[in-house]
Amino acid sequence: MKILKRIWVLAAVMLLCTSQVYAGTAKSGAGKKEAAPETQYSKDGKWIFLGDSYGTHGNPSLPELITGCLGVTNFKSYCRGGYGVAKKSGGDDQRFVSRILSAAIDRSVKNVMIIGGISNDRKHSKEELRTNMSKLARTIRAKYPNSAVYYIIPNWHANWKGGTVRIQTARLYQRRVLLRLPWYKELCAENGFIFLDKVSQALRKSANDNFFIYDGHHPNVLGRQRIASAVASYFS
């Protein structure tokens, strides 16, 4: 059943990606493209996804849409809502690294993509993030020694006009959280991760567009498709 579902998702997403070659990048002047590490990327290699609810929300999910756009069928998602780089809640370990500690070493993995985490890490200091990002990097390299590692944080900078109290609250919340975004870019650079900035900004939008569900920051299917198309554009 899982195989049939993936085949269906792949067919639907490939159709979507051919018709939508990330128009948002063109609008925002993204002709200046980040260089893709061609020696690492391979459609034949396995993909691993680590992330929070950005990687689990919706059907098809963001990992399914990304791999569909890339024509990749061999992937595994370890995403789970509420997780982050450094997050611990009481005695509960909700760090990304905890999701792969028991995973077997897999040299067939060529690409690891980390999605989100910034809102769940909001109570942790920069030094806590640094310590845990370093541990995450060491663990990924031990488990998947042939992989390149990418990090995306889907952008919440939306031009909401008016709106409900819920949306206004989400807007204030996201501004506070995204003040920490430079930390993630810096720590990715320190650990050899590739922060896909243009992909992370795929949801910048005009007031007439709507890429989010009711909570104001999780992408709806259109938003997820836009992010997936941005990833495909990066690798094209």
Could you say what each language-model-derived stretch is?
Residues 1-50, 54-59, 64, 68-73, ...:
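N-terminal secretory targeting modules
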Residues 156-236:
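Catalytic His-Asp segment of secreted/periplasmic serine-dependent ester chemistry enzymes
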Residues 125-145:
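Hydrophobic, well-structured mid-protein blocks that either form specific transmembrane helices
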Residues 117, 151-154:
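A cross-domain feature marking catalytic cores of carbohydrate-active enzymes
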Residues 64, 138, 182-185:
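Active-site phosphate/pyrophosphate- and oxyanion-stabilizing loops and adjacent acidic/basic residues
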Residues 100-101, 133-137, 181:
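Generic structural signal for well-ordered alpha-helices
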Residues 112, 147-148, 194:
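Proline-centered loop/turn at the N-terminus of a beta-strand
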Residues 41-131:
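Conserved SGNH/GDSL esterase-like catalytic core that processes O-acyl groups on lipids
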